[in-house]
Amino acid sequence: MTDVEVLISTTSPEVPLPTYAHPGDAGADITTRVDVTLAPGQRATVPTGICIALPAGYVALVHPRSGLAARHGVTIVNAPGTVDAGYRGEISVTLINTDATETVHLSKGDRIAQLVIQAVERAAFVTVESLPGSHRGEGGFGSTGVGGA
């Protein structure tokens, strides 16, 4: 595992920097900079107070926190969110409360997502008349579960 230098600024001094909970973790926890209340089924775009400058050839992916999803039904609408290397604005996270009955309250400073930094491979798309065959072929949604439990 290598450390990639990511420049960071915050919208105010009290905004916590992203933190890794354990050595070897892929995702660094990011927090909300405001109090948020999500009614059942409600979504909101939540500011984190952090801005980053990624090196060329890298992307930051914003992933849901598994504990927030498991305990409260809160996840990210466009998971994973993509922060391109050229973006310099504040990172925001669009959360949704999938619980049908319970309202969720998040307080300023609560961890709401994980930021994963990855190297990017760009594709060179090549138009062809037909694609080469494969074992899977054109089997789509649910095709690998046919005949199984």
Role assignments for model-derived ranges:
Residues 1-149:
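DUTPase catalytic domain/fold
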